[in-house]
UniProtKB/Swiss-Prot annotation:
The gene is MRFAP1. Found in a complex composed of MORF4L1, MRFAP1 and RB1. Interacts via its N-terminus with MORF4L1. Interacts with CSTB and MORF4L2. Keywords: Coiled coil, Cytoplasm, Nucleus. One of its GO terms (molecular function) is identical protein binding. Its main location: nucleus. It comes from Pongo abelii (Sumatran orangutan). Residues 87-118 form a coiled coil. It comes from the Eukaryota. GO terms for cellular component: nucleus; perinuclear region of cytoplasm. InterPro entries: MRFAP1 (IPR029254). It is found in: Nucleus; Cytoplasm, Perinuclear region. This is MORF4 family-associated protein 1. Transmembrane segments: none annotated. The keyword Nucleotide-binding does not apply.
């Protein structure tokens, strides 16, 4: 390897150095504006997710009220039949009461599972 001759070495290219204001306007300002838009978008989506979750909870609450009303009506109907028995109707009423109680327990369990599911969804959306 031979030593370099100073005449053979090329002069380095000159790099344009921007003033701080130009550097800020050209490079940093667009990035900052884009980040602001992203943050605003995330805030809007968070609000929509919160409203969706609240809406689902409200729907579930209405469903539970309807189910409770139906179960109470079934119980009341069964009790009316029990109070005025007629022969074989006693046995049938007992069966219906048992079925109504089983259905009420199933519905209550389903309602608890729905509430737990919504809470999980709400927690996952908030994190």
């Amino acid at each position: 390897m031979r030593p370099l001759d100073i005449d053979e070495v090329e002069a380095p290219e000159e790099v344009e150095v921007l003033e701080p204001e130009e550097d800020f306007e050209q490079f940093l300002l667009p990035v900052i504006n884009e980040m602001r838009e992203d943050i605003a978008s995330l805030i809007r989506e968070h609000g929509r997710a919160y409203l969706r979750t609240r809406s689902k909870l409200w729907e579930m609450d209405n469903m539970l009220i309807q189910i409770k009303t139906q179960v109470e009506a079934s119980e009341e109907s069964a009790l009316n039949h029990v109070q005025h028995p007629s022969g074989e109707a006693d046995e049938r009423v007992s069966e219906l009461c048992e079925k109504a109680e089983e259905k009420a327990k199933e519905i209550a369990k389903m309602a608890e599972m729905l509430v737990e599911l919504v809470w999980r969804i709400e927690r996952s959306e908030s994190s």
